[in-house]
Amino acid sequence: MLFRSAPNFSIGVAVFDRVVAEAAHLFAQLQGFDAHLIETHHAAKKDAPSGTAGALAKTVSGGLGRPIPVTSIRTGSVPGTHEVIFDGAFEQVRLVHEARDRRVFAEGALVAARWLIGKRGVFTMRDVLSSDSEVAS
């Protein structure tokens, strides 16, 4: 068994990735909507954008069929906030995932590890959440 590198093991981020993928697909069918991503992390975080922001931007860009801008903010002690914004002339849709504690990453890694028991192959967090999978809680 092998788990391909994941930018983020939070179960919430894995769900968020699927939600923004569907939103991007729907907004791609409409005219007049732009998208961008804003991420905020603690001041000591070295990479900008983060791996999670890069993965989410790739998801949204893939759904829209065009690249999106990413804004990175490093301040305070924020564990991680990712906001995808679909912006139209008369309305705006904001989708947000906010990690309130770094334990979510460890918990997600444990869920993924339990899910991997007895499996062979290369997997991602999307596989852990696939419709035919049982995610341990």
Residue spans for each PLM region:
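Active-site PLP-lysine loop of aminotransferase-like
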Residues: 9
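Short, small-residue-biased leader/transition segments that mark boundaries at the very start
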Residues: 1-2
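Rossmann-like NAD(P)H-binding beta-loop-alpha module
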Residues: 15-32, 48
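C-terminal substrate-binding/catalytic lobe of Rossmann-fold NAD(P)-dependent oxidoreductases
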Residues: 31-137
